[in-house]
């Protein structure tokens, strides 16, 4: 049933992509971030939905009357420079077979990012993209938040298998990244009930990040919440809400969660933390020995 729904959704969205290429960019963002096919058990599980959407969107953009121009800005220039540098490092990769396989995977994503930059032109397009990204990641925030509440925080929240956010750390990063967009979603809500729904979704997403048991999520989330408070128009109201809600969530987590977070103070005794620190030292050594980089898979 889930497979049929996804295939019908794909067929249903294609005509709209030919009408407006930006619809393809939005659909790709949904599939790439939400990974709905990973919730199926049939042929849809491994079906290349993202590739199909990318090809259809690219073809639609090429045949459309819209301007085919990349709007250059500082951020876009940095992105294109980064993409170029990734290709350079792949040429000098220490593990060429692995490097080119990963390069192929990454460049497909980068191609669609460039297409998205070209097709998202208006303010409404930007808002639509923000909503799609927020809801796509918010789906896993909702699911993970409910799971954390029902399990009492005794189990880790994981992402969809075979995706960029499959393990607890990458999922936590996605949840923390989604929170500002969910806050933006609250401001866009036209009715009281939609606003309350968006607030609940943001709260569950924060709980999902906490339930991931990721120490990086705790540090990143704290920094992000401080930044949101700093940019808030009503700092007093926002500050009081954070002071009241945050401790309740943290105190509700079990002792094993508190113990893992407290291990930050004794990182020398934690294999995971020391492994990352060793990886940082290794990265510095690679950069010193190979100015052009070690390429994908060097770790």
Where are these regions (language model features)?
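Transmembrane helix boundary and interhelical junction motifs in multipass membrane proteins
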Residues: 23, 215, 219, 294-296
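Membrane-interface loop/short-helix elements at transmembrane-helix boundaries
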Residues: 156, 163, 255-299
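Short aromatic-rich membrane-water interface segments that cap or initiate transmembrane helices
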Residues: 37-43, 159-171, 272-275
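Alpha-helical transmembrane segments of multi-pass inner-membrane proteins
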Residues: 8-17, 57, 80-91, 108-115, ...
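Conserved catalytic core of Hanks-type protein kinase domains
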Residues: 17, 33, 106, 119, ...
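Transmembrane signal-anchor hairpin modules in multi-pass inner-membrane enzymes, especially those
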Residues: 1-88, 97-101, 121-131, 186-196, ...
């Amino acid at each position: 049933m889930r497979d049929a729904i996804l295939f019908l959704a794909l067929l249903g969205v294609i005509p709209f992509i030919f009408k407006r290429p930006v619809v393809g960019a939005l659909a790709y963002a949904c599939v790439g971030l939400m990974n709905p096919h990973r919730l199926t058990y049939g042929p849809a599980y491994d079906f290349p939905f993202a590739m199909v959407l990318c090809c259809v969107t690219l073809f639609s953009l090429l045949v459309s009357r819209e301007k085919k121009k990349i709007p250059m800005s500082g951020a876009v220039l940095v992105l294109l420079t980064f993409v170029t540098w990734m290709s350079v490092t792949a040429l000098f990769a220490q593990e060429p077979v692995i490097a080119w396989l990963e390069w192929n995977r990454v460049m497909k994503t980068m191609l669609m990012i460039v297409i998205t930059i070209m097709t998202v032109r208006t303010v409404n397009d930007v808002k639509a993209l923000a909503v799609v990204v927020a809801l796509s990641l918010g789906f896993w925030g909702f699911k993970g938040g409910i799971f954390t509440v029902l399990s009492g925080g005794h189990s880790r929240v994981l992402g969809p298998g075979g995706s960029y956010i499959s393990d607890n750390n990458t999922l936590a990063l996605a949840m923390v990244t989604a929170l500002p967009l969910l806050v933006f979603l609250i401001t866009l809500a036209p009715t009281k009930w939609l606003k309350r729904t968006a607030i609940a979704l943001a709260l569950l997403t924060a709980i999902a990040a906490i339930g991931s048991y990721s120490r990086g999520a705790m540090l990143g989330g704290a920094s992000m919440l401080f930044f949101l408070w700093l940019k808030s128009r009503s700092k007093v109201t926002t500050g009081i809400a954070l002071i009241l809600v945050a401790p309740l969530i943290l105190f509700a987590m079990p002792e094993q969660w508190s113990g893992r977070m407290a291990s930050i103070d004794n990182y020398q005794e934690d294999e995971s933390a020391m492994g990352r620190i060793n990886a940082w030292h290794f990265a510095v050594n690679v950069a010193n020995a190979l100015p052009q980089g070690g390429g994908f898979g060097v770790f």
